[in-house]
Swiss-Prot record:
Residues 28-157 form the HTH marR-type domain. Residues 71-94 bind DNA. PROSITE patterns: HTH_MARR_2. It holds the Pfam family MarR. This is Uncharacterized HTH-type transcriptional regulator YdgJ. Keywords: DNA-binding, Transcription, Transcription regulation. It comes from the Bacteria. GO terms for molecular function: DNA binding; DNA-binding transcription factor activity. The gene is ydgJ. SMART domains: HTH_ARSR (SM00418), HTH_MARR (SM00347). The keyword Cell inner membrane does not apply. Gene3D superfamilies: Winged helix-like DNA-binding domain superfamily/Winged helix DNA-binding domain (1.10.10.10).
């Protein structure tokens, strides 16, 4: 759905043509709408293509580069809330991809490590992830990719600086 079709629907629903045009027809609104659309579909398509969610793959990748790490340190590195990390790790553990144990010196700390099966999953996911990214960025030139990276980084910085 484009901004224009969204505007039409809002005009029909609200009967407020002037407000809708001012609020939803701006270039900024179209950018926000497109970003939200990409955000909605990218996770679903990524998981369908790779067989694993981006969050779980990120956790496995971090563990791939660490021998063993505390669950709280892992949570800080991925910037996902602790309950979500726990859920992800429980599912990964049930699939044999990670193992968790209590730290002997401090039973409050849970240590996490990648299993051999998890290591194999990371290695097999690399090709799937590369294929997904290649298809996602088809018809986007190298120059456009560099520009997109720059623009998104600046937008992320701007968003982080917004006072709530």
């Amino acid at each position: 759905m484009t901004c224009q079709s969204l505007i039409y629907q809002l005009i029909v629903l609200t009967g407020k043509k002037g407000w809708v045009l001012a609020s939803f027809c701006s270039e900024e609104a179209e950018i926000l709408y497109q970003l939200q659309g990409v955000n909605k579909v990218i996770g679903v398509k990524f998981e369908a293509c790779t067989g694993i969610s981006q969050s779980r793959l990120e956790l496995l990748t971090l563990l791939y580069h660490a021998d063993e790490i505390s669950q709280s340190d892992l949570q800080k590195k991925v910037n996902i809330d602790s309950a979500a990390v726990t859920r992800h790790l429980k599912q990964l553990e049930s699939k044999g991809m990670v193992s968790r144990r209590r730290k002997p010196e401090d039973n409050r700390i849970t240590l996490v490590r990648l299993t051999d099966q998890g290591r194999e999953r990371i290695e097999s996911s690399k090709k799937e992830k590369e294929r997904f990214m290649k298809e996602m960025l088809a018809n986007v030139s190298a120059e456009e990719r560099r520009l997109l990276i720059d623009v998104l980084a600046r937008m992320r910085n701007n968003i982080n600086n917004i006072e709530a």
